[in-house]
Curated annotation (Swiss-Prot):
Entry superkingdom: Bacteria
Function of the molecule: Produces ATP from ADP in the presence of a proton gradient across the membrane.
Gene: atpC
The entry's keywords: ATP synthesis, CF(1), Hydrogen ion transport, Ion transport, Membrane, Thylakoid, Transport
Record keyword Isomerase present: no
Binding partners and assembly: F-type ATPases have 2 components, CF(1) - the catalytic core - and CF(0) - the membrane proton channel. CF(1) has five subunits: alpha(3), beta(3), gamma(1), delta(1), epsilon(1). CF(0) has three main subunits: a, b and c.
Protein name: ATP synthase epsilon chain
Localization, UniProt: Cellular thylakoid membrane
Keyword Transport assigned: yes
């Protein structure tokens, strides 16, 4: 028996396929999902979601949202998502560098908050890119 996993953003579906296991970056910590998991609704933070399908792990950078688990279906609704193998690592590193620079130089509260969010997003993208497609 498998899980049906969907990762959906406001403008596209990033993943829609069966899987054996899912690890979610819930706001309360990493959350592992296997078949026949109890029904669950959880908040998703900025981080890396991992999906094991066909015996191989795939990484997806996700940015804030919710996940619902019910009847062997995992539905993840997030603001942004990018599969690890599709991440432009150089662009993510540039975003991280820029965010770090703003944090080191700006005293504007709004700029610093945005820079912290950009930093989290960049780190998730880089981590997903490095995980790529592992067995």
């Amino acid at each position: 028996m498998t899980l049906m996993v969907r990762v959906i953003t406001p403008d596209r579906t990033v993943w829609d396929a069966p899987a054996e296991e899912v690890i979610l970056p819930a706001t309360s910590g990493q959350l592992g999902i296997l078949t026949n998991h109890a029904p669950l609704l959880t908040a998703i933070g900025n981080g890396v979601m991992r999906v094991k399908a066909g015996g191989k792990w795939s990484a997806i950078a996700v940015m804030g949202g919710f996940a619902e688990v019910e009847n062997n279906e995992v539905t993840v609704l997030v603001n942004r998502a990018e599969r690890g193998e599709k991440v432009d690592k150089a662009a993510a590193q540039a975003l991280l560098d820029k965010a770090s620079q703003v944090l080191n130089t700006s005293s504007d509260k709004q700029e610093r908050l945005q820079a912290k969010l950009d930093q989290q997003r960049a780190r998730a993208l880089i981590q997903a890119a490095e995980m790529g497609h592992k067995s």
